[in-house]
Amino acid sequence: MAQDGRTRQQRAVATRAAIIDAAAGEFDEHGYLGTSMDAVAERAGLTKGALYFHFTSKADLAGAVIARQHEVSRQYGEAAATRGTTPLEVLMWMSQGLASQMIHEVVVSAGIRLSTDTAAAGVARRNPYTDWMQVAAELVRQGIEAGEIDSAWDPQLIGRVVVPAYTGAQTVSDVLADRADLYDRLRELWTVLLAAIVTDRMRPEIPRLVALIAPLATED
Amino acid sequence: MAQDGRTRQQRAVATRAAIIDAAAGEFDEHGYLGTSMDAVAERAGLTKGALYFHFTSKADLAGAVIARQHEVSRQYGEAAATRGTTPLEVLMWMSQGLASQMIHEVVVSAGIRLSTDTAAAGVARRNPYTDWMQVAAELVRQGIEAGEIDSAWDPQLIGRVVVPAYTGAQTVSDVLADRADLYDRLRELWTVLLAAIVTDRMRPEIPRLVALIAPLATED
């Protein structure tokens, strides 16, 4: 009995994950308004009844895609953190990781698109922005402690500036070049942002730091 | 005869403008996918046939809203240019003007929303970004000449960074605060961007410059 119960629960978890993947594909291709519950059910190979058992509305589903995207991004962020040996390196690796994921992971691409989609105004989507602002602010705080970032800066202010600037770089890269120049745009953005915030001893390091924002050798 | 002809043409121009206004209202409220030609015709008080006489598709209409928004923004930009007495002041006044328009002019709000709407991928919308990058780059070039901006910077690079950063600030302000904090976000953004690019003699002027980005006394 207990094992049956667990198996059923595991199956439900797997179905839920498959639905989120299918929904991500639809949202990524057709935007929020262009996606229907019918299309998601069909893509996931489920009846509409089975879909509604897991998600009661499209807004609910979009919220789950954004939450999943944020979870995937956070995991990658933690992995990125282990690549960097200083706060600024970690910040660069996180930028690299987010860009890489945006290009390669449909759930990330879909989550980011939903997060900037006017039509998705009713969807829960504020947390990713405010969470990343906190992450960036914390790294800036560490950067100040490590003597990499000028202590005159308020870490919270830098967090509030960096996250929207990053968001805009990916939006404009999407509109102008289908994200083909995303790494270039991010390296240019960080070249300017770092020039504003680093201490004099870190200034010569800016080209080395921004060069970390590039496709990994393992990427196509 | 000639006079009749002109009258008919003037009427056509007025109808076209009324359609663009109606479309802007619909796009602003419902996004690209959520807007129908029927709703635009109804809002403009026209038959669908009359609407199609002027615009052959929704993408055509969205392109016209973006073009009109860009025209309005450029006009305001030129007016803003006359308020500033130095290149950096002009850059700040332009930022103020764009923010003010985004809040007060439906066609601008709608145009910007269409310009960042994933669902509007088929719509002509690259020009506003590339045009503003050129405008910003030209002001940076003038700022270098005037000794306000460090000559080590490539004006084109700064243009490519500033415009997406500005775009992202408005997107995030829209998502997090319905644009209520747009001026605050822009002042913070420029505090960082100016710190990166100004010459040492202009550094003490940064607070005065960013303070120009605020609601005008004539605004509500």
Describe the residue ranges of each PLM region.
Chain A
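Basic, helix-initiating cap at the start of DNA-binding domains
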Residues: M1-H30, G34-L46, A59-G63, V72
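C-terminal peripheral helix-coil segments that are non-catalytic and often amphipathic
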Residues: A2-Q3, T130-Q134, E138-A146, L176-D220
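Amphipathic alpha-helical interaction segments
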Residues: A18, E89-G97, L157-P164, D184, ...
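A short His-aromatic
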Residues: Y52-F55, A59
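Phosphate/oxyanion-binding loops and surfaces in catalytic or ligand/nucleic-acid-binding neighborhoods
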Residues: V72, G97-Q101, E105, A165-V172, ...
